[in-house]
Regions:
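Compact, glycine-rich, soluble single-domain proteins
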Residues: 51-69, 84-85
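Catalytic strand-loop segment that frames the active site of acyl-thioester-processing enzymes
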Residues: 17-55
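Small-residue-enriched segments and motifs
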Residues: 20-23, 88, 108-110, 150
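HotDog/MaoC-like acyl-thioester-processing domains
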Residues: 102-107, 111-169
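Hydrophobic beta-strand-centered segment that forms part of the acyl-chain substrate-binding groove
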Residues: 3, 69-109
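Conserved positions in beta-strands of structured domains
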Residues: 23-26, 96, 111-113, 153
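Short aromatic-glycine motifs in intrinsically disordered, low-complexity regions
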Residues: 6-16, 139-140
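RNA-interacting cores
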Residues: 1-7, 34-39, 52-53, 66, ...
Length: 169
């Protein structure tokens, strides 16, 4: 097992630079992961016309990175390289807020619900909740406030050839 906390998280995800959104992994096991993400003023997902808050639906990418980090630590623990993964869709998506203000520190939790190793597909029940509210918003967004939850359907191609076939290359 990787010692926790794991910080930075870029080696767990097939992302780089500002696209890596998770600050650290606090804990993980065979079926779950708990990470932290801060909505920073330079967050790549912030819309130019509303730079003070992340649209709630963008939280799906943060939850997907929680799933990706889980897959990353599982791969590293097994001596395998980190693989590319895809968010296929969501179910039971529930928004606690329409937007997540800059400065919000969030708990990101992903719990494995179903895994098909033969086809490299899985379902994870995920949540984003306020860990630390942004300054001045403590009454509006107290710690523990559920921001977003849902079941994420994911797929990871087993190899480069399979990915090329999917992409029609």
């Amino acid at each position: 097992m990787q010692p926790c906390p794991i910080k930075p998280t870029d080696h767990l995800l097939p992302h780089s630079g500002r696209m890596v959104l998770l600050d650290e992994v606090l804990s993980y096991d065979d079926t779950s992961l708990h990470a932290v993400c801060t909505v920073r003023p330079d967050c790549i997902l912030l819309p130019p016309d509303s730079p003070d808050a992340l649209p709630g639906w963008q939280g799906m990418e943060i939850m997907a990175q929680g799933v990706g980090a889980w897959a990353g630590v599982q791969a590293l623990d097994a001596g395998r390289p980190v693989q590319l993964g895809f968010l296929l869709g969501t179910r039971k998506l529930e928004f606690g807020v329409p937007a997540i203000p800059v400065g919000t520190v969030m708990d990101v939790k992903a719990v494995l619900s179903w895994l098909d190793n033969a086809n490299n597909m899985g379902v994870f029940d995920c949540t984003l909740a306020v860990r630390t509210p942004p300054a001045g918003r403590e009454a509006e967004l107290p710690a523990g406030t559920l921001l977003l939850s849902g079941a994420l359907n994911v797929f990871s191609p087993p190899n480069r050839e399979a990915l090329d076939a999917i992409l029609g290359r």
